[in-house]
UniProtKB/Swiss-Prot annotation:
This is Apolipoprotein A-I. Glycosylated. Palmitoylated. Participates in the reverse transport of cholesterol from tissues to the liver for excretion by promoting cholesterol efflux from tissues and by acting as a cofactor for the lecithin cholesterol acyltransferase (LCAT). As part of the SPAP complex, activates spermatozoa motility. Its main location: secreted. The modification Methionine sulfoxide is found at residues 110, 136. Belongs to the apolipoprotein A1/A4/E family. One of its GO terms (cellular component) is chylomicron. Sequence repeats lie at residues 68-89, 90-111, 112-122, 123-144, 145-166, 167-188, 189-209, 210-231, 232-242, 243-266. It comes from Saimiri boliviensis boliviensis.
Length: 266
């Protein structure tokens, strides 16, 4: 179990390098940058969609009848959540910095393995890209006469054009599949090599009991520190939510009382 936890941490911290095994057009992000980006996108999405749902509910017949005024408290709730995010920022930043530092050597070894395998497969990727471009050029050349013929009105029906295009498209499809199959065959040994290297690194880590225990102790220490430092932020969140919850409670009870009066008067 210890090895699994540490493995996940190391793989996450080396995620940018593994991703750039196939992509080279974007600069690598730090682990904390990736966490912040994902969290920001998720929170903003939930916030916007949540506000839309609340708005739809309040404009519905039931919402108008209950008159809970949820949107009146939405900005207050959003402000409280944003404040929590700001308070936790430095704390979680410190946690990831410590974890990244503790696993630096192992990550360097794994990144080295990735780069070595990447260098071996790059010629196959370049060759595949070249062949693919050649196929596209050939496809364009074969389509040119058909396009000209179509523009000149030689085809009276669209079905005629489809019939002439079908063999060309099937030929391109079959040739593309052949290239992909060839590339898959060429890359298979290197994929196995990469998995074997990773397995070797992890096995060495498991056999190194003292080192693994040290990593485990440091990780537990960092998590405990994170929990202690986050307590004030969550207490602030709780205090910030109290007025919102109290307002909701009052509105809801008022709506129930009004509904009960209507029932008794019928």
């Amino acid at each position: 179990m210890k090895a699994v936890v540490l493995t996940l941490a190391v793989l996450f911290l080396t995620g940018s390098q593994a991703r750039h095994f196939w992509q080279q057009d974007e600069p690598p992000q730090s682990p904390w940058d990736r966490v912040k980006d994902l969290a920001t996108v998720y929170v903003d999405s939930v916030k916007e969609s949540g506000k839309d749902y609340v708005s739809q509910f309040e404009t519905s017949a039931l919402g108008k009848q209950l008159n809970l005024k949820l949107l009146d408290n939405w900005d207050s709730l959003t402000s409280t959540v944003n404040k929590l995010r700001e308070q936790l920022g430095p704390v979680t930043q410190e946690f990831w910095d410590n974890l990244e530092k503790e696993t630096e050597q192992l990550r360097q070894e794994m990144n080295k393995d990735l780069e070595e395998v990447k260098a071996k497969v790059q010629p196959y990727l370049d060759d595949f890209q070249k062949k693919w471009q050649e196929e596209m050029n050939l496809y364009s050349q074969k389509l040119e006469p058909l396009r000209t013929e179509f523009q000149e009105g030689a085809f009276q029906k669209l079905q005629d054009l489809r019939e002439k295009l079908r063999p060309v498209a099937e030929q391109v499809r079959d040739r593309a599949r052949a290239h992909v199959d060839t590339l898959r065959t060429q890359l298979a040994p290197y994929s196995d090599e990469l998995r074997q290297r990773l397995a070797t690194r992890l096995e060495a880590l498991k056999e190194s009991g003292a080192t693994l225990a040290e990593y485990q102790a440091k990780a537990s220490e960092h998590l405990s520190a994170l929990g202690e430092k986050a307590k004030p932020a969550f207490e602030d969140l709780r205090q910030g939510l109290l007025p919102v919850l109290e307002s909701f409670k009052v509105s809801f009870l008022s709506a129930l009382d009004e509904y009960a009066k209507k029932l008794s008067s019928q």
